[in-house]
UniProtKB/Swiss-Prot annotation:
Record localization: Cytoplasm
Protein name as catalogued: Triosephosphate isomerase
Keywords: Cytoplasm, Gluconeogenesis, Glycolysis, Isomerase
Primary residence: cytoplasm
GO molecular function annotations of the record: triose-phosphate isomerase activity
UniProt: substrate binding residues: N9, W10, K11, G174, S213, G234, G235
Length: 257
């Protein structure tokens, strides 16, 4: 049985006081450790504050991005080793905002995934289609293109996948819209089938998160779907009560283990 995960992407939000408040709220919520695994992705400037609060707990944290070089004259960038030095276990790669605003290509995303793996980080790789692509019936084609760049990086000699996939329909991010549980499930099945072409065993164990306006009032229905293993939460992760409600929905789904 695959574990569950709820990941909160704080994006470019919060100061140190906010980080302490949110982290403490999660820690004091009485969630059962690792069911689900709870991960937060704060801005780089808040990683230290989060790590100091969470270092003796089951709560995990990660970076929102990284550069593919280990060090050098890359002003404004951050390396995998730097994230590891801050206690990060995970890193987001290929978020739709990075793809759209910063024009990150599939090739660049592959470079970042490789750098993350070399640094001992677990990449949470984001894929998804825009509203225009969806309207043209291109969802499967877009996902196939994005994933055919990523899935060859699966370590076929490992017993567990070395990365996580987050499906984020771009049309649902920050809009209040969300794919129905059945729509999201269908896409997750498609992703798992693509992964099975590389390894049926790893595909069965591959953690697939849904990210698209996940909230406390729709999380349970999403987590009831067989191939939705958790959520990548955006705006709702900045509201302690809402985020904890999502975590409790994952906890109640009974799929941890």
């Amino acid at each position: 049985m695959r574990p569950t995960m709820v990941a909160g992407n704080w994006k470019m939000n919060g100061l140190s006081g906010d980080a302490v408040h949110l982290t403490q709220a999660i820690l004091h919520a009485g969630l059962e450790p690792m069911r689900p695994e709870v991960v937060i992705f704060p801005p780089f400037t808040l990683l230290h504050a989060v790590s100091q609060e969470a270092k003796s707990s089951a709560l995990r944290w990660g970076g929102q991005n990284l550069f593919w070089e280990a060090s050098g004259a890359y002003t404004g960038e951050i390396s995998g080793a730097m994230l590891r030095d801050m206690g990060c276990r995970y890193v987001l790669i290929g978020h739709s905002e990075r793809r759209q605003i910063f024009a990150e290509s599939d090739a660049q995303i592959v470079q970042k995934i490789k750098a993350a793996l070399l640094s001992g980080l677990i990449p949470v790789v984001c894929v998804g289609e825009t509203e225009a692509e969806r309207a043209q019936g291109l969802t499967d084609a877009v996902l196939r293109r994005q994933l055919e760049a990523v899935l060859p990086l699966l370590n076929l000699e490992a017993s567990q996948p070395n990365l996580i996939i987050a499906y984020e329909p771009v049309w649902a991010i920050g809009t209040g819209l969300s794919a129905s549980p059945e729509q999201a499930q269908a896409v997750h099945v498609f992703i798992r089938e693509l992964a099975a072409a590389y390894s049926a065993q790893l595909a069965r164990r591959l953690l697939l998160l849904y990210g698209g306006s996940v909230k406390g009032n729709n999380a349970a229905a999403l987590f009831d779907q067989a191939d939705i293993d958790g959520a990548l939460v955006g705006g709702a992760s900045l509201q302690a009560g809402e985020f904890i409600q999502i975590c409790r929905a994952a906890e109640s789904a009974g799929r941890g283990g």
